[in-house]
Amino acid sequence: MGAVVSRWRAKPSTVEVLEGLDKDIQVLEEYREKNHKQLKLWVYRLLLYSALLYLMACAVVYAWYIPERMIGKLIVASPFLLFPLLIWLLRKLLIILYNKRTERNNEKLEELKAEKKKILEQVMETETYKNAKLILERFDPDSKKKLELETQPIGPTVTPRQGQELRHRLVSPRPTGRPPPVPVPGPSVPGTPLSAPGGPPEKGLSASTPQALIRRPGTPVGTPIPVMGMHPPGPPLARPVLPRERGAVDRVIEYLVGDGPQNRYALICQQCLSHNGMALKEEFEYIAFRCAYCYFLNPARKTRPQAPRLPEFAAEAKTSQDPPAVAMETDLPVSPPAPESKEAGPEPVKAGDGDPQTDEIPTEEMKPGDPEPHTDIPDKSDGEQDVSAMEVE
């Protein structure tokens, strides 16, 4: 009869089984906390009452009854020596008893938790998604918290400032088995300057994008269309960012050469505090760069010193400026002085006002193309020179 009645009874549902397990687990956890509190309370009471009893016994024996003989004194003092040891043993016994209770309680608790975990795994395999989600939210909140932590991004969310854009790459999956499409350059518009790769977007590019973004027939709306000449905004980094993961060979080479992250300085933008690569110690103070994110021009901290000009270059420049005058001075002939006659006086011969000065040729009127003066004047003998001197007198 009982078997027939048990057949007609409905089996408990998964929710009811989990509720019963939750109640048992909660009772066992409360019992464990209760045992822990009772252990502390009993140990505290044992030590307190034993200390008070010990002090009272010492005071009574000292006040009313102290034997005169040495043997009597030892017999009276022996309980006072054994009493602390007895209290220590009682404390150890209490700790052992409560530890055994706690161990049995923990074993039952682990069994119930394992059974609950097994039922939850069966629920995830057998129940529908909606029922499984409700059961997990109700009876397994830890797994829900783990899923939320996994889905949440690690670190603070980056909000772009005004004038600063975050660069995202749109990667469209290519179909396997087909060759990649060859880009066909469109008609170039004359007069529109092309932007350098990695530079800030120019106006000419924005004017040509509406024509390039026209959707071709047969392409879906959501698929991105590649545009010729498009590049991420911002100039390239002033110096490349060194890789974080470096091998042993790279470290050895950096140690021998004296290069590496520990020997470089980071280029931080003064406006948006963004990292723009690393520069060497020698060029850090003299480098000026434009930020790759906010386009702010960061000036150099110091101006690079320039070496003074050598004096040889100045002398060469002076000589190259006036070569004709030097040539004229070197080309003038030095005529030998005419021998003076005995009759001639010490006074020099003065030419008349009307006589032209044929002997003196000014160097200012001479030109490089004129013939040299010594080629036109014939040489005279000593006798002819004496006759001409007498005629002048």
From Swiss-Prot:
Q: Does the keyword section mention Membrane?
A: yes
Where can this protein be found?
Answer: Endoplasmic reticulum membrane
Q: Which GO terms describe its molecular function?
A: identical protein binding; zinc ion binding
Similarity section:
Belongs to the lunapark family.
Say if the entry is tagged with keyword Zinc: yes
Record PTM: Phosphorylated. Phosphorylation occurs during interphase. Phosphorylation also occurs during mitosis; these phosphorylations reduce both its homodimerization and the ER three-way tubular junction formation.
Q: Which UniProt keywords apply?
A: Coiled coil, Endoplasmic reticulum, Membrane, Metal-binding, Transmembrane, Transmembrane helix, Zinc, Zinc-finger
Under what name is this protein listed?
A: Endoplasmic reticulum junction formation protein lunapark-A
Please list every transmembrane segment annotated in the UniProt record, as residue ranges.
Answer: 46-66, 70-90
Sequence ranges of Pro residues compositional bias: 176-190
Question: Cytoplasmic side: which ranges?
Answer: 1-45, 91-393
Indicate how the chain sits in the lipid bilayer: Multi-pass membrane protein
Kindly report every residue range on the membrane side named Lumenal.
67-69
Q: How are the domains described in the entry?
A: The transmembrane domain 1 and 2 function as a signal-anchor and stop-transfer sequence, respectively, generating a double-spanning integral membrane protein with a N- and C-terminal cytoplasmic orientation. Transmembrane domain 1 and 2 are probably sufficient to mediate membrane translocation and topology formation in a N-myristoylation-independent manner. Transmembrane domain 2 is sufficient to block the protein secretion pathway. The two coiled-coil domains are necessary for its endoplasmic reticulum (ER) three-way tubular junction localization.
Its function, per the record, reads:
Endoplasmic reticulum (ER)-shaping membrane protein that plays a role in determining ER morphology. Involved in the stabilization of nascent three-way ER tubular junctions within the ER network. May also play a role as a curvature-stabilizing protein within three-way ER tubular junction network.
Task: Give the C4-type zinc finger regions.
Answer: 269-294
Provide one Gene Ontology biological process annotation. positive regulation of endoplasmic reticulum tubular network organization
